[in-house]
Amino acid sequence: MQEKIELNQEVAKPLAEKHTPMMQQYLRIKADHPDTLLFYRMGDFYELFHDDAEKAARLLDITLTARGSSNGVPIRMAGIPFHSADQYLAKLVKLGESVAICEQIGDPAASKGPVERKVVRIVTPGTLTDASLLPDKSDTFLMAVHQQTTRRGVSKTGLAWLNLASGELRLMECEAAQLAREFERIRPAELLYADGIDLPAVACARTRLPEWHFDQDAGTRRLLEQLGVASLEPFGCAGLGAAIGAAGALLNYAATTQGQSLRHVRDIKVERESEFVGLDSATRRNLELTETLRGGESPTLFSLLDTCATAMGSRALRHWLHHPLRDPALPRARQQAIGVLIDHGIDDLRSALRKLADVERITSRLALLSARPRDLSSLRDTLRALPHVRACLQAEPDSSLLSLTVAELAVPQACLDLLISAVAEEPATVVRDGGVIARGYDAELDELRDISENCGQFLVDLESRERTRTGIANLRVEYNRVHGFYIEVTNGQADKVPDDYRRRQTLKNAERYITPELKAFEDKALSAQDRALAREKQLYDVLLQALLPHIGELQRVAGALARLDVLASLAERAQTLDWSCPERVGDNVIDIVQGRHPVVEGQLAAESVPFIANDCQLNEARKLLLITGPNMGGKSTFMRQTALIVLLACVGAYVPARRAVIGPVDRIFTRIGAADDLAGGRSTFMVEMTEAAAILHHATPASLVLMDEIGRGTSTFDGLALAWAIARHLLSHNRSHTLFATHYFELTQLPQEFPQAANVHLSAVEHGDGIVFLHAVQDGPASQSYGLQVAQLAGVPQPVIRAARKHLAWLEQQSADATPTPQLDLFAPPPHPDTSDDDEPVSIGKPVQVALLPEQAAVLDALSDLDPDSLTPRAALDALYRLKVLAGEVVDAA
């Protein structure tokens, strides 16, 4: 980037001589920001020129014009009003663009050439702080990633990410293979990286920086300077060289975009993989934590739980859901606090919380000196309300977490006193409109306001006094734009004019005068409003500086309020939805009684339909449940609800179950549903196998694994064999808690070989030609899949259903009448003495090519007509039966 800037500057030099002074200034500034759109302030507009203008016109749907010329070329330009710039910035940032804001910092009246201008900040997708640009209920992260190779040749990948709107900075190191999972967890809005790094796909803006920006030693110095400490050891950063290098690049970039230091970044939190329950991108997507499978915001677990009264509470809840904890200590403390809130009532507390402002983001804008007047008044009103919030908790000392929260909600009194004395009760939106500083805070400002506001009364009083003093009854004190203030006396009264009157204007029938007092008032009055606004701006800037020492206290208050809001929201949800407190134990067990899927139950409740609750028991003697049953029967719902109950327990919430006992959990894996990865060039089956491979490589005895219809994307025999082998591996090697849904009824034989496996099914009953799903989990395998009935429910035409029913009856009859053909038992051990390892193939002799009989050709034709990737499990079974019939005909013909 630096080379590009220097090149642009060199190009600009010879061109500058042929451009107007204003365009020369623009080109110099643009050369410093070649990769961003430049908003160039001209009066009441931000103008864009040349390529920037064309791009902005296209992206923002604004008018592109050409006015005049520079260097003989028409100047393409587009503009937006400065007072509505935020809405255009929001659109550009959403599209992944960055914008440099260039303001007029000189006085136009005093400028001989172009007004002095300067880029005051750069708005990028990852460095947003303005309320109008930020989503209320989610955080925006700037992330830097750096890969470092140690002297021993070990490659380390360091991550640093910053929420500029809160000042929260986090570091971690991971393996390069885990980057995709971390990107999905953190979801950065902008990613900083150097050349040569191999990055997985990530849906965010990318900014490439020179390698030297990520230097570890420079990063260490930058962090020490930022935190004001002599060592990073107390922060747990020892050995995190790659992450420290990333943090240095990130902090320098963020400070550059803001045009100032980051005063609110005062701490580092180091995250480690062992801290959280592992959730890969497939699991987060399949469980629909904060986004539906179709990309919507609702219905999700977050949308169900988010009854938070404040935006900072909603953001904290989102963070909790994506960061379930392995250590049960903090989740237990949260659940204890929720129980106390339920017992003591939460209505008053939630009512108090609803009146509070977003202290977290206001504090960040204070630190960056960009807080607006109504930010300050909202902050003042929130601090005033803290004693009432604390009073709602004073009677609830039974929770250590609530006690800590009460302590952290102590009012920063000096900050509050300053805001009360300095800020008007109802300030204007922006300082330039005036009325921001409270009356009585500054004597000079009060005087200027009095002059401006009481001008009319002063003139009335002066006129009355002068009539009395001079004896001129018809004397008038007036004002016009040309001559300003004056005293008018008719010619007939001219002999009574005092000596201190100075003639200002002569009219036909009157004379106009000015006095020293009126002249002094005129000087004040004519400039009072401008001077008042200037004084108010000066006082406001001083006020922002005076609030900086209170940033730490305000961050403490914001964190406590967000935590309290989440706990109150979870308490309300538990109470309203009849959830229970889970029991966390050390045994490797998942025992759920009458569990429900929280989101599905909520959707059904809206339609007054009851949800059928089910039990789930997994332990050392019962590690894998083979789940069979009809499509639409509820298999996937049962699996997902189990995972969500476990996740909620690890978050520290209550759970949708009558009772839940949850042991240690290190990861949750899901292999549910699939679709082609067109961008990655992967078929449905390839996506399925990739996810299955990740599970088989990483699942442990403390993991929860959900497998839904594995093997369906290939031929029936291949899929069946893979499904059996995967289930067997999970039982014998991973030994994870596993829910394994399948339509391969042959798999229901697995418990005969592995006692730790058990069959359960989702029940259904036929009613006439239709089917009634009972959604109840029962022991044992299902008897059939009810594929035709489900097809009928889906609206398949009746002629097709009738034809399928007849063909099914024929297939079943043919299958019953066919002579059994000798074949290898799929589940029989290989004909070798050692059956403990599946690596060796079973040798069944070399194939010999022979002439085909017509019956054999029919088998090949049937096989060639099959499209394995498009077969449903039921269709695959139908094809299998058909092939079996054809194989019988081959045997008969032989």
Curated annotation (Swiss-Prot):
Binding site for ATP: G629, P630, N631, M632, G633, G634, K635, S636
Region (Disordered): 819-840
GO biological process: mismatch repair
SUPFAM superfamilies hit by this protein: DNA repair protein MutS, domain I, DNA repair protein MutS, domain II, DNA repair protein MutS, domain III, P-loop containing nucleoside triphosphate hydrolases
A GO cellular component entry from the record: cytosol
Domain of life: Bacteria
Key word DNA-binding present: yes
Transmembrane annotation, as ranges: none
Keyword presence, Nucleotidyltransferase: no
Annotated GO MF terms: ATP binding; ATP-dependent DNA damage sensor activity; damaged DNA binding; mismatched DNA binding
Keyword entries, A-Z: ATP-binding, DNA damage, DNA repair, DNA-binding, Nucleotide-binding
Function (record text): This protein is involved in the repair of mismatches in DNA. It is possible that it carries out the mismatch recognition step. This protein has a weak ATPase activity.
Family: Belongs to the DNA mismatch repair MutS family.
HAMAP family, sorted: MutS
NCBIfam families linked: mutS1, PRK05399.1
Protein name as it appears in the record: DNA mismatch repair protein MutS
Organism encoding this protein: Cupriavidus pinatubonensis (strain JMP 134 / LMG 1197)
Gene (UniProt): mutS
